[in-house]
């Protein structure tokens, strides 16, 4: 499910009660985005409401250390500086961009993705491919990001069908391809396809890769 404001509030409360020193985000983009929001608010308590972090977040402190373990090959949230939260009441998604939310460790292991059903593998894979294409065609693109995005397009194009069939080579190619795409678009942004997907996801609670 798409991460909500209430998910973040509950996570902040739970973290405070636990006395933990760091966060381990295991899952897809929703789990990692929720962890980023929790970690930022814990480290910057003046921002109690995650909605106040929309846009380029004005935080001063790095978030609580996050170890990200993606179980899908799509969002690349383990290597990006943004997170997306859903405002259920207003039926909208908002993006928070903050270099302080980058996980300190990313464990990108294709074996952790091998239990994904075919539909989820396909939809998250298309999200990764869209990242690479939009990142390559955005006006902010330059030589270094072109290198990332073109390689990601190559890997994903060769690997997605194999990943849906749950082959070892397909899973490995998708794990690397989506990661490289994240390294690229995190520097230059995305395009209108993602803007439309955020709207559809917020109104209909559609999974991001499908929207």
Range-by-range predicted roles:
Residues 188-211:
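C-terminal catalytic subdomain
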Residues 82-188:
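Carboxylate- and glycine-rich phosphate/diphosphate-binding segment that chelates Mg2+/Mn2+
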Residues 1-5:
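Short beta->alpha junction loops
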Residues 11, 34-39, 132-133, 156-159, ...:
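Buried hydrophobic packing segments
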Residues 8, 32, 126, 150-153, ...:
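Short alpha-helical patches at coil-to-helix transitions and adjacent helical residues
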Residues 6-111:
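Glycine/threonine-rich beta-strand-loop-alpha-helix active-site module
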Residues 41-45, 135, 203:
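Active-site catalytic microenvironments for nucleophilic, acid-base chemistry
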């Amino acid at each position: 499910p798409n991460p909500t404001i209430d998910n973040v509030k509950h996570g902040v409360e739970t973290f405070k009660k636990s006395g933990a020193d760091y966060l381990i985000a295991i899952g897809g983009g929703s789990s990692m985005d929720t962890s980023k929001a929790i970690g930022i608010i814990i480290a910057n308590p003046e921002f109690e409401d995650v909605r106040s972090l929309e846009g380029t977040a004005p935080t001063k402190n790095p978030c609580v250390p996050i170890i990200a373990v993606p179980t899908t090959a799509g969002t690349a949230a383990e290597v990006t500086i943004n997170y997306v939260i859903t405002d259920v009441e207003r039926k909208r998604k908002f993006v928070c961009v903050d270099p302080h939310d980058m996980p300190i460790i990313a464990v990108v292991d294709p074996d952790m993705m091998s239990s994904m059903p075919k539909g989820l593998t396909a939809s998250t894979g298309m999200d990764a491919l869209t990242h690479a294409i939009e990142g390559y065609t955005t006006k902010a693109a330059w030589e270094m990001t072109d290198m990332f995005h073109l390689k990601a397009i190559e890997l994903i194009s060769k690997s997605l069908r194999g990943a849906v069939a749950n082959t070892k080579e397909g899973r490995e190619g998708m794990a690397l391809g989506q990661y490289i795409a994240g390294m690229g678009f995190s520097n230059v942004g995305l395009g209108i396809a993602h803007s439309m997907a955020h709207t559809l996801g917020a109104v209909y609670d559609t999974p991001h890769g499908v929207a």
